[in-house]
């Protein structure tokens, strides 16, 4: 059965196509079910004999495989481009490798083309397009009878226009045919309401060239020294602290939903392997790992989706479009700090399932960009961003008494610090895994605090 928004959006798209209007753009929050929407529209177009074939393009093999499965189920046929199939799911990268015969053959058919996460393709014309955008503009755009472009995060970090998107003038705001926001999705119980925990530290010290500097926050340290954010996310004790929070929260959720899982987004393969070791050896967790260096990552993701393993550690393999509804906890330790990536990662824990306990928790460090992104996850709702007292390291429920919140105009900070905690850089000889000297001799993190941002409070 379709969700209400999927029904309304599909009806609107079909009305537009029936009027011979070629293009439809849908912006729907990550985790809302855009693939099911696209498959439904494709099914209706085939049923009404408005198209003969369906092509889907997406940014990764993981997403492409998910699309293939959803379309096969919805259309009740194979969706691999072979005999008896009505279409195929491909990656944007594969477009440039398809033969001329492939494109010539398609010209004999009416083709419905679905562009998933279209923001990966930039350019309003060939001159300002990226490689994927050029392929869409030169090989796909004119071929398609109808197109459906979809994105949960319809903007680009480089501020270039998205392929086939329309913008108003003069402010350049994206024009969409249908929009389904996170606020709407949470109200409809389509997505979980997220809680974001920003871990900061009040007594940091950086020792470099026999000079000791002290700072009251991660933000202050990063601004006033050459220490990089990577130094924080690669610090052994810092990793252990964030993972400890994640493990305790996952354990709490699994008391109610035994199949709940956690995702750790790492910055490199070495980082992911270190994180896996910590989770296994220090916290006795069961862990899967998927990176471009590991064999059969798609199979590993599928195994994790179906089994009861507690954690999956990923480097770029599980971000946008990856459908694992049992994920309810995320530890964000990636060095990528763009709002696009942040929201896509958050989207991995927002998909609802049949569990009665639909919490979603993201843990990360209080870095400047991440603070900003977290604060505006849902900035239009009053009292949506608050400081929350952490009752203990085990119980991470935010302090949310409505009569208390109503007394504050914007933010209320309720701090609870844990003293006598020192995170030291334990890497031998102050070298990183690549053998290069660190930017500092020692990083110590003492008293720390946690800030919780609870979005979409009722």
What do the PLM-derived regions correspond to, one by one?
Residues 29-31, 119-121, 138-163, 189:
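Conserved helicase ATPase motor motifs in RecA-like P-loop NTPase domains
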Residues 68-106:
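Inter-Walker segment of RecA-like/P-loop motor cores
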Residues 19-41:
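Walker A/P-loop
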Residues 35-45, 50-72, 267-270:
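Conserved Walker A/P-loop ATP-binding site and its immediately adjacent core
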Residues 159-258:
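Interdomain helical connector at the RecA1-RecA2 junction of SF1/SF2 helicase-like NTPases
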